[in-house]
Amino acid sequence: MVYEVHIPAFPLNQFIESFVYYMDYNPAHTVDRFLPDGNTYIVIDLTDYPKFIYDNNSLKEIQSCRNVWFSGIRTNYITIPSGRDSEMFVINFHKGKTYPFVEMPMNELTDYVVDGELVMSTEILNMRETLLELI
């Protein structure tokens, strides 16, 4: 298993809390539930198969996520895959500091996970291709 956390230097550290990269993580459980914590994330999936968001009660798939997506502030918990067999790069933002990177008001993204192409600049979206070239 690989799990790396990088704290960016100035000026990115004013906005980004950390970069997280992981692969070959294989927990025994299949789903995770994340409580609302006021954070926002850009998730870059480095695999070719979709990840899902599940209904919190029935655990039925309610949304598919591919390549790059943005996860807004939550007011309720979210149920997602545990990360088994995933390879991801996650950008964790400081609370309230996402605005330079997402081209949409944050209040419109509360409780939503949206395709990166809908809310992010081309430069952010191109990060996935750059990361794939590096690994």
Regions found by a protein language model. Give the residues of each.
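Alpha-helical bundle regulatory/interaction domains
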Residues: 1-135
